[in-house]
């Protein structure tokens, strides 16, 4: 697993897509430049998450691409996933680190500056800054970070920042140039007519921005 696994994260949103079709989609994205996959399926049971996660791991493990589980330490442990991405209401980060050990990835979502500052002392690997811009997947998000908020967050944060929310080819370069270590997205992948080509283009944009 590369240290910069958070460079380009695909967040899942399978909905009613048949499993084999969705796995083909994920495979195309991974082969074209996605550096990690985040399993985020709010409506699934623990058992269903294990089934879906196991199918994803069959694609990701041979390529050494990490699978990060949203919200659930127990699913992460049962899957032996690479890590977990926790929100503010998903439990205690210190307890999660004790359960997962030192080698699992822990991402921590923040929505406010106070949450970001509090995260500086937490045993996490990266911080998810959400939401950066308006997005259909989180219509309830009103306090958006924007570019100015991102730049302030980068100057104050002790952890790598992964920007989340409303990021696509039109703004991804500016996001990483502003200091984000990576981006995570749903729509930029799922709404693409050709997911493989869209991923390749997005990865090239991110790589250029990180070199600036």
Swiss-Prot record:
Keywords: Magnesium, Metal-binding, Thiamine biosynthesis, Transferase. GO terms for biological process: thiamine biosynthetic process; thiamine diphosphate biosynthetic process. One of its GO terms (molecular function) is magnesium ion binding. PANTHER family: THIAMINE BIOSYNTHETIC BIFUNCTIONAL ENZYME, THIAMINE-PHOSPHATE PYROPHOSPHORYLASE. The lineage of its organism: Bacteria, Pseudomonadati, Chlamydiota, Chlamydiia, Chlamydiales. Belongs to the thiamine-phosphate synthase family. Binds 1 Mg(2+) ion per subunit. GO terms for cellular component: cytoplasm. 4-amino-2-methyl-5-(diphosphooxymethyl)pyrimidine binds at residues 38-42, 138. Its EC number is 2.5.1.3. InterPro entries: Aldolase_TIM, ThiamineP_synth_sf, ThiamineP_synth_TenI, TMP_synthase. It comes from the Bacteria. This is Thiamine-phosphate synthase. Mg(2+) binds at residues 71, 90. SUPFAM superfamilies: Thiamin phosphate synthase. It catalyses: 2-[(2R,5Z)-2-carboxy-4-methylthiazol-5(2H)-ylidene]ethyl phosphate + 4-amino-2-methyl-5-(diphosphooxymethyl)pyrimidine + 2 H(+) = thiamine phosphate + CO2 + diphosphate; 2-(2-carboxy-4-methylthiazol-5-yl)ethyl phosphate + 4-amino-2-methyl-5-(diphosphooxymethyl)pyrimidine + 2 H(+) = thiamine phosphate + CO2 + diphosphate; 4-methyl-5-(2-phosphooxyethyl)-thiazole + 4-amino-2-methyl-5-(diphosphooxymethyl)pyrimidine + H(+) = thiamine phosphate + diphosphate. Pathway: Cofactor biosynthesis; thiamine diphosphate biosynthesis; thiamine phosphate from 4-amino-2-methyl-5-diphosphomethylpyrimidine and 4-methyl-5-(2-phosphoethyl)-thiazole: step 1/1. 2-[(2R,5Z)-2-carboxy-4-methylthiazol-5(2H)-ylidene]ethyl phosphate binds at residue 166. Its cofactor is Mg(2+). Condenses 4-methyl-5-(beta-hydroxyethyl)thiazole monophosphate (THZ-P) and 2-methyl-4-amino-5-hydroxymethyl pyrimidine pyrophosphate (HMP-PP) to form thiamine monophosphate (TMP).
């Amino acid at each position: 697993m590369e240290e910069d696994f958070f460079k380009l994260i695909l967040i899942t949103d399978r909905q009613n897509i048949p499993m084999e079709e969705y796995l083909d989609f994920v495979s195309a994205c991974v082969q074209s430049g996605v550096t990690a996959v985040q399993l985020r399926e709010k409506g699934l049971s623990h058992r269903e998450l294990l089934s879906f996660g196991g199918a994803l791991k069959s694609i990701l493990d041979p390529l050494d691409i990490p699978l990060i589980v949203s919200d659930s330490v127990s699913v992460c442990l049962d899957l032996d996933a690479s890590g977990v991405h926790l929100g503010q209401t998903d439990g205690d980060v210190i307890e999660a680190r004790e359960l997962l050990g030192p080698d699992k990835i822990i991402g921590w979502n923040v929505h406010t500056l106070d949450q970001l500052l509090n995260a500086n002392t937490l045993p996490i690997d990266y911080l998810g800054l959400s939401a950066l811009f308006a997005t259909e997947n989180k219509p309830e998000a009103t306090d958006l970070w924007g570019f100015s908020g991102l730049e302030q967050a980068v100057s104050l944060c002790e952890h790598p920042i992964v920007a989340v929310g409303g990021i696509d080819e039109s703004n991804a370069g500016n996001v990483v140039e502003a200091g984000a270590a990576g981006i995570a997205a749903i729509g930029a992948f799922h709404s693409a007519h050709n997911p493989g080509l869209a991923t390749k283009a997005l990865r090239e944009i991110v790589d250029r921005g990180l070199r600036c």
